[in-house]
Amino acid sequence: KRKFLDAALRYYSISQIEKKAYLPDKSTVLDRAMIEHNNLLSASK
């Protein structure tokens, strides 16, 4: 489970960086990433 979490977080940070390249609304991307991050954390409990 821990490895999955690390991989997922790495994927989200990479996709976030990619999205920032062509998405002007950075706050929306950040909010989405935080929601996904929180979902992962609660799912791992």
Swiss-Prot record:
It is found in: Cytoplasm; Nucleus. The keyword Cytoplasm applies. Component of the CSN complex, probably composed of CSN1, CSN2, CSN3, CSN4, CSN5 (CSN5A or CSN5B), CSN6 (CSN6A or CSN6B), CSN7 and CSN8. It comes from Brassica oleracea (Wild cabbage). One of its GO terms (biological process) is red, far-red light phototransduction. It comes from the Eukaryota. The keyword Cytoplasm applies. One of its GO terms (cellular component) is cytoplasm. This is COP9 signalosome complex subunit 4. Belongs to the CSN4 family. Keywords: Cytoplasm, Developmental protein, Nucleus, Phytochrome signaling pathway, Signalosome. Component of the COP9 signalosome complex (CSN), a complex involved in various cellular and developmental processes such as photomorphogenesis and auxin and jasmonate responses. The CSN complex is an essential regulator of the ubiquitin (Ubl) conjugation pathway by mediating the deneddylation of the cullin subunits of SCF-type E3 ligase complexes, leading to decrease the Ubl ligase activity of SCF. It is involved in repression of photomorphogenesis in darkness by regulating the activity of COP1-containing Ubl ligase complexes.
